[in-house]
Regions:
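PLD/PLD-like phosphodiesterase catalytic module centered on the HKD motif
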Residues: 1-213
Length: 213
């Protein structure tokens, strides 16, 4: 297990997904054991990121996802629509992809419930192109405090696992980063209900037999 506790001196923690045992996903997995909240800033969001953290994200009291409207080639059609529609289309496609995997039926209902309860909130920043990537974690213990992983990894399964990224953990500047996050969060549009509707529609496509067979 990699030490994610406060570092002494100027030791720098880099997470680049190059080490099979230490990827961005593993970093978030370990923080979920000790954190109460997670604030995510990402160019775009795919449901696979939360499914990969299934069993861990549930330990958090609050998750906020602040996303941009970036799209991958498979969702180019969204470019013809509005900014917020792009983000929703991207999520729609990512859900279709995840439905081919066995963890979809067990993972998505929990996410739906978390959005309904307000545990997970999603907003889209549409004032300008939003290209930021950061994971701000707030530990339950004041001794551990807060930390931020800032770099290039989007909150997508490839961004957390396969892509070579460059993410650096910061501890001393977290208050400044949190203020930046709050400012952009307030300027963003709440799309939690839209995300919920998209996910509910996909879950509803399964018959009771398919769910319990």
């Amino acid at each position: 297990m990699t030490d994610i506790s406060p570092k002494s001196g100027d030791e720098l923690l880099i997470v680049d997904n190059a080490d099979p045992e230490w990827k961005t996903l593993a970093y978030l997995h370990e923080w979920a054991d000790i954190a109460r909240a997670l604030d995510v800033a990402t160019g775009y969001f795919e449901i696979g990121s939360l499914l990969a953290l299934d069993g861990q994200w549930q330990k958090l009291e609050k998750i906020r996802i602040l996303m941009g409207d970036e799209v991958t080639p498979r969702t180019r059609r969204a470019l013809l629509e509005s900014l917020t529609e792009r983000a929703k289309a991207k999520l729609d496609v990512s859900i279709e992809s995840e439905k081919e995997k066995n963890d979809f039926l067990t993972g998505v209902p929990a996410i739906v419930e978390a959005i309904q309860s307000g545990k997970i909130e999603c907003r889209v920043y549409a004032k300008q192109k939003f290209h930021a990537k950061a994971y701000i974690t707030h530990a339950r213990s004041r001794v551990v405090g807060s930390a931020a992983l800032v770099g290039s990894a989007n909150f997508t399964l490839p961004g957390l696992t396969n892509n070579i990224e460059l993410n650096v953990q910061l501890r001393r500047e977290v208050d400044q980063l949190q203020a930046w996050y709050e400012r952009h969060w307030e300027e963003a549009e709440d799309v939690s209900e839209d995300v919920l509707k998209i996910m509910q529609r996909h879950v509803a496509e399964y018959t009771p037999f398919e769910v319990y067979a």
